[in-house]
Amino acid sequence: MALTVTKTSNWTIEDSEQLYRIQGWGEPYFGINAAGHVTVSPKGDRGGSLDLYELVQALQQRNISLPLLLRFSDILEDRIERLNACFARAIARYGYQGAYKGVFPIKCNQQRHIIEALVRFGQSHQFGLEAGSKPELLIALAMLNTPGALLICNGYKDRSYIETAILARRLGHTSIIVLEQPEEVAEVIAVSQALGIEPIVGVRAKLSTQGVGRWGTSAGDRAKFGLTVPEILTAVEQLRAAGMLNALQLLHFHIGSQISAISVIKDAIREAGQIYGELVRLGANMQYLDVGGGLGVDYDGSKTNFHASKNYSMQNYASDVVAGIKDACRQRGIPDPTLISESGRAIASHQSVLIFNVLGVSEVPKITPEPATAEEHLIIRNLYDTYQAIDENNYQEAYNDALQFKGEAISLFNFGYLSLPERARAESLFWACCAKILGIARQQEYVPDDLEDLEKIMASIYYINLSVFQSVPDSWAIDQLFPIMPIHRLDEEPTERGILADLTCDSDGKIDQFIDLRDVKSVLELHPFRPGEPYYLGLFLNGAYQEIMGNLHNLFGDTNAVHIRLTPKGYEIEHLVRGDTMQEVLGYVQYQGDALLEKIRCRTEAALAEEQITLAEAQHLLENYERSLRSYTYLSS
């Protein structure tokens, strides 16, 4: 293992680009300008960019406090355009006779302004929506107004869900009910007959092809959703017996939310193509093939099959889907179906950037120790001698010695043979040894396994104005990696190594895994914190799933969110969605602000009567309490 090598020459923005890998995960939307600030180009390579640091400062001048979620509508539009353009090129290249009609899975980001923008941007492509629950179906019915767009109805379904989806046909929706559980078949038949409306029905297949990584269990015989091949055949016969086989028009599969290897996609397409052909042979009126999600996001910029990356481009993906289904249909002499993908992660991730500030830093002491004297305890003299002797020839042995002496010092203290000042002296010497050893280790091409954790042990803790549980729950829950970096000072060398600790009173409220080249780093390169000066960090590619899955741990609520649109003169704020106030989050757990305030007022009156508080103090307390109820749940800068 090689530790981060510290440069001794003058630092440049090119060094920062390489260190934070922004050209890998950020293209074509994010870069670094000559001022050392992160820039965002919401329209990709079509021109126009904003200085992210200057944008954040301008928003703060408008009383929009950090932490802050920036949503760039132009990026959302660009993602839809790119996805449709990739499929259009693939269709033209392979002479595919069907069309492509994408849908956005609402579960990826249910925010109203996001869905409104997606529907608007997708109109020219007949881009539709996918619902995975009854509430999401209600959103889709109301928001989707694009003629010819598809409404894919997934998830668990009761009679009410099925009735709503079928009745939506009367509003002109092309609503397709995807059968995912065996019992849904009879329910759809019964509801259809009761309403006198023939639905469009699909089946979700449990492919034997499985993805890799943490989403690999989305497919396979024991997947949560879908029908096995025998269950699909049973569904076909049930529909045939009811005289409704003509309603079966779609095959759907899903092999995972983030597929890192293109080979997995190819295998799934091959298997699905054969199932589709067999359904045609059995007499179903097949028209659509829904390849589900899986189009990945390159979170670490490595372009590999690492779980935080993908070894293919969007064009590779589209071409393999089109070519695979084209081959399957040509073999059987059947028409090419309309292709559907549910590429929510690939569409929504890039448009959101989470900005937060550093509140303070806890560092390992960086001191040159005073020489040990003959009067000091032997363990202290041993630690100092170890420190003095450290060089590039013995740094591994010295580290093991320092660990041993530190352990002995703690044992001596616990048995009463060392005083508290002596223990403090021993610990300071131990950290001085570690700092000296780490300085040598960073210059080596190879570092022994014994020293792999040294970088993390010596890392500073940067306290951030954020709740990991609220804003990046996947970082905590499934160890997902997101690109994180400073948005300014990138013309300076980041000489510190740190982890990020959030505001919650929970030891899990931290981020201590960071992107690396096809690997995971335990520390992030950061700049020295300057008290009194703002230090802003950005977390990128977090537009899918994070907002809705966040929770209220310690009652930290939603952050402020600003929708930004590029204009010829700069930018405009399309929407400002204020984050939760303390009164709002207290309401979520059944506390009423007025009732709480009244309780405090009664207590202050009682304290006044007992002369425990002055009138001025009571007034100050009440004003502060009332102001706090109306305030943001996060710390003010």
UniProtKB/Swiss-Prot annotation:
CC cofactor: Mg(2+); pyridoxal 5'-phosphate
Record Gene3D superfamilies: 1.10.287.3440, 1.20.58.930, Alanine racemase, Lyase, Ornithine Decarboxylase, Chain A, domain 1
GO biological process, one term: arginine catabolic process
Sample GO molecular function, one term: metal ion binding
Coiled-coil region list: none
Enzyme Commission number(s): 4.1.1.19
Chain sites annotated for binding substrate: L289, D290, V291, G292, G293, G294, L295, G296, V297, D298, Y299
Catalyzed chemical reaction(s): L-arginine + H(+) = agmatine + CO2
CDD domains referenced in this protein's UniProt entry, alphabetically: PLPDE_III_ADC (cd06830)
Keywords: Decarboxylase, Lyase, Magnesium, Metal-binding, Polyamine biosynthesis, Pyridoxal phosphate, Spermidine biosynthesis
N6-(pyridoxal phosphate)lysine modification, residue list: K107
Family classification: Belongs to the Orn/Lys/Arg decarboxylase class-II family. SpeA subfamily.
Functional note: Catalyzes the biosynthesis of agmatine from arginine.
Protein name (Swiss-Prot/TrEMBL): Biosynthetic arginine decarboxylase
Origin species: Thermosynechococcus vestitus (strain NIES-2133 / IAM M-273 / BP-1)
Lineage: Bacteria, Bacillati, Cyanobacteriota, Cyanophyceae, Acaryochloridales
